[in-house]
Amino acid sequence: MNPRGLFQDFNPSKFLIYACLLLFSVLLPLRLDGIIQWSYWAVFAPIWLWKLLVIVGASVGAGVWARNPRYRTEGEACVEFKAMLIAVGIHLLLLMFEILVCDRVERGTHFWLLVFMPLFFVSPVSVAACVWGFRHDRSLELEILCSVNILQFIFIALRLDRIIHWPWLVVFVPLWILMSFLCLVVLYYIVWSLLFLRSLDVVAEQRRTHVTMAISWITIVVPLLIFEVLLVHRLDDHNTFSYISIFIPLWLSLLTLMATTFRRKGGNHWWFGIRRDFCQFLLEVFPFLREYGNISYDLHHEDSEDAEDASVSEAPKIAPMFGKKARVVITQSPGKYVPPPPKLNIDMPD
């Protein structure tokens, strides 16, 4: 295991989002099953933490941007700052939706169509953000998720207000279409990983990468699909499972997503104005972490390392040479021993 290779591509933004969603997905079924009697404002605490960190991080980043104009010419600083502003705008609309949801569940005084109104604005904004992101090669997971689900948001709001009386299985038709596409992606990765496993022209690193991607997509999509099917049957009263048992597959998907953040490049460097990779920033703030970060473990090449150590130990040792001018001791590397050239003899004629 190489900690440096593990953390150098770490994406803290996505890790924070998945961790907050995981904690929220644990508290919500406990509240729905009546195990805890907390207010929904408390159940949504992980979501509030997520949005608070987004707002604070963007505010600090904007302050650093305004006070240091020279930073604006560093690489893609301008593109990353604009991407941060777009993400903050989408998060503010999502925060408005979540506040309205909590208020509607606690008091029940307004229509669900009004609650979902921020999501109806998020979708066109996300479409514009996707167009901009594709032009600048940005990560677009959240924007794509919000833009393709506009029809799903409308169906759910109409069903909750009892304007339509469709079963939930029909209400979630847009979601089934999206999951079908994700299943095709999983099948694509499985086929390519099998082809790479049977190919002799592919290096082991590429083969391992494709197999890992296939396993990751399987453990994300399949449990997510199981969760959605169980939830729909529970809402339609086709089963009486507890919400905790229904949410277990979702926990597996979120845990897998959290694990994938350690190998996903990306992340905006302007959050909190750090202007560098998150792990590099941590190493500068906490220098003692470098001692662990410089250690690597390789359990698969012990024999080869022993052979190398033996060859190094058998190399001839060279006595140190004393330099008169520099007054330092110079020792040649034992692994790079070069015999001295022979003395040149020139025979002069009589």
Swiss-Prot record:
Keyword terms: Membrane, Transmembrane, Transmembrane helix
Membrane topology: Multi-pass membrane protein
Transmembrane segments: 16-36, 41-61, 81-101, 111-131, 168-188, 211-231, 240-260
Location (main, coarse): membrane
Subcellular location: Membrane
Family to which this protein belongs: Belongs to the TMEM185 family.
PANTHER family (alphabetical): FAM11A, B PROTEIN, TRANSMEMBRANE PROTEIN 185B
Name of the protein in its database record: Transmembrane protein 185B
Taxonomic source organism: Mus musculus (Mouse)
Source species taxonomy: Eukaryota, Metazoa, Chordata, Craniata, Vertebrata
Gene name as annotated: Tmem185b
